[in-house]
């Protein structure tokens, strides 16, 4: 079965190996056909950063503020990464925000009230997320209640659970060194560079190996120049970010030095890599897309649809738990509003702004990170410009609507230009 | 025409609750031949196919595969015998590409990682083996394909698994003239490659264009199974609408009202 001879008149061989120009023309025609991907998020990010950089050059562009963006956006981004899985099935989890609050409250209780070590608390929080997700998923997949209703009920109930777990409705402080470090400490500059190098080399290895295997088998490959461009692009972006984060950002170096990559960054990066691998490179991930695209087709293909539907809620709530841990770390405490107010809408907004479709079947974990960056920049920039919380909510709401419109319109466009 | 039929059904009965949909149905399917299964809406064609593919259990009857009695209790049993079905409503995912659709649920892996190059190669070989040249890239999403191309992918998916019997439920119902011709040509090629093919169709032109044999179902009964060359258009239409035609079909009037599904009221309840 290794005949390259067959390939010669095989259908794929009809198209010659694309050139760089051809590659970009393909990309443009995909965009015009409605497959905009992460383009709106990237453009939005550039526009927003430019605007804020002009309006508040000294504060927005400072190294300290750049580092702030990561710690500010981390919790929402982590929750959004889990939401992508639920959205891929065309479902929704409105309870993810307060689920993260419940898990954070469990964390605080275990570590502060009961006095267990940090890792027991983390395990307890994540386990709570797994239990929550399993329950939600069962109600949706086995009983057949629409996810909107199940998770709306969860939204209310979990809000109550947080209140019950945080006795007297005040707060529980989190003072454990390791837990506090997650959202408040940085990697040493050398370690930051080492991890960056590892990431770039790892990415390059994966890309080049893939290119070589495909070329060796006579399959169509992206032009090597495009592959090189991707690797170079990643190296430049990561390099620039790490360089800035490694600058001294303490107001008074004599008192304390403050520099390095915030610890949440490698945490998000590792989860991004793991979940991207799961979605793109395993049959489980393939089946998630299939169930999101056409549930009946997936069922006939022998895929355990219920199992997939339950599992995405488990992933979502577990990621919410991790988001909750980061939020608790950043605030040094858990209160009844942890995971509340705007957290859920910011997370849904992040996923959708990044390019994940609300209609199911389309989305990547990277979308949550890009969209999370957009949300963080809006929140941060508008704060620097002195706008009140009211204005920030309105603007974020409008941005979410914009993103949802792009999603709906690109779907219509795809329906009009494709045959369906 | 070969001596042992690939698949032989005898005395198949199937009821849904009080409604008997299939009554004492017999069917023989030979390798290298296209057997057209015809019948009015609600005659039980889709139900018969679902019995063969293991989706519905039968109430009575025998299955012989290559002359051996077999039991088909699930779609997996059918698949392991080499029976593949292309359903009336195409079971494709719009958001996946051609290769991903062809291997859906049966992905090739190395370790836990999907083996994309192997799947892409096998898909290309299958399409090349069927002389399919209408798709330009194996990596294009199925949503961007025309109806005929989608049907082509669905058929290629069915033959990817060394299948011996491919059943197509009204594959041309939603297609235009040119695309219908393409798909029929492909159906013919499957049989010429040695597969047994069962083609369900309403369209007499299609049936006479590609089939070797015609099996006519009338209100759940197999009223005739004849070689296509031995029968005329008009006779087939009579078999479909009245259950008999001259010496063919039912001997007596079957219309002892009430105990069989009526074609008129079953069009909406049928499997789409
Ligand atoms: N799952 C089912 N439950 C009850 N009745 C069914 C079911 N599937 C089909 N039927 C009935 O069986 C009869 C034959 O249907 P079908 O096999 O779909 O006919 P055809 O494909 O020939 O149009 C119809 O009367 C239909 O209503
Ligand atoms: Mg039918």
Protein language model features and the residues they cover:
Chain B
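Glycine-rich phosphate-binding loops of nucleotide-dependent enzymes
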Residues: 2-272
